[in-house]
Amino acid sequence: MKRKIRRLATIAALSLSATLWAQGPHETGIYYQPADGKSGAELKTAIGEIVLPHVQRTYKDLWEDFKSTDVRADGKIWDMYSCITNYTPGVDQNTGTARKEGDNYNREHSMPNSWFNKEYPMYTDLHHMYPTDSWVNNKRGNDPFGETDAPTYSSAEGFSKLGPARDGLGYEGIVFEPADEYKGDFARAYFYMVTCYEHYVNEQGEHKSISSWNSTMLARNVYPALSQWAVEMLLRWSADDPVSEKELNRNEAVWIIQQNRNPYIDYPGLEQYVWGSKSDVAFSYDHYGQETDGIRQAAQTRLRDGTVYTLSGLRVDGRPLSKGVYVRDGRKFVVR
């Protein structure tokens, strides 16, 4: 009897140990576990069901929220449409009009609200809402993101551009091209939106689907949800402009306010498992992108020799490392 109890206790301890070790990135625990083992369309659906439940904000709330989500190190608003602004949060908010770039900032739906008929909860979802220069925002209107070689309007220093789509993009029409340094940010915001709102309930209690949304960037279905030219462009944008520390910090701030996350920030390259070259590869929420070959284990210690990076490419700089997988001198190692 004692032997049986001892065996059960051992099994329970091993089970608990496995659960404690099976953790997602950025202390997300088992938040993404329901998506484990899935790929392609099935993965998109599973992730959407995970991130859809969240605290809905009011449109007025966003002014205060931006003070946590979009402030630079110098205390000014982080504007992704203009490179010349230095807005003070809560002071330089748009009060009605803007006559030129640099006047004030407003609440930008990076995915234009006309595409989803101004419905909630999309209308105030912080994962695609940003404070941007009001003048540049108004120039964009509800035009899709894209790339142009012949802009009819450019913000200061050519930072953002509006004009006809370039040849070979796969789309003919007017597009708004953000700065290269933020193209990945917007791509991941779009991946989030078409994943989160695959199916949802609007403020009237109606069951809706992203297939009802209307835009040239959208496919009017739940998968792939994005039109082919948009998928190809956004995958390229995300690869060329990988997840930054700004995005990681913003994701954490939105998590605190809204209580849901953008998985395409937590798992850099996740979009490839949904739409890209890895769409037939099973997603692993706690061993994402890790290979068993060539991975070394290290004790919990300060590693002084060589520069250490996280798998997302962030430099660690010699501080005590938390549990996880890191890269040093071109080799992976695990800290347990």
Where are these regions (language model features)?
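Bacterial N-terminal signal peptides that target proteins for export
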Residues: 1-12
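C-terminal tail/sorting-segment detector
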Residues: 6, 325-336
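Hydrophobic h-region of N-terminal signal peptides that target proteins for export
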Residues: 12-22
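N-terminal module-boundary/linker segments of secreted carbohydrate-active enzymes
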Residues: 22-87, 273-281, 314
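Short cysteine-rich loop/turn motifs with clustered Cys
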Residues: 76-97, 103-104, 133
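Domain-level detector of nuclease and nuclease-like folds
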Residues: 95-106, 110-291
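Residue-level detector of functionally pivotal "anchor" positions at catalytic/ligand-binding pockets or at interdomain
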Residues: 279, 284-312
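C-terminal trimerization/auto-chaperone modules of long, extracellular attachment fibers and adhesins
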Residues: 316-318
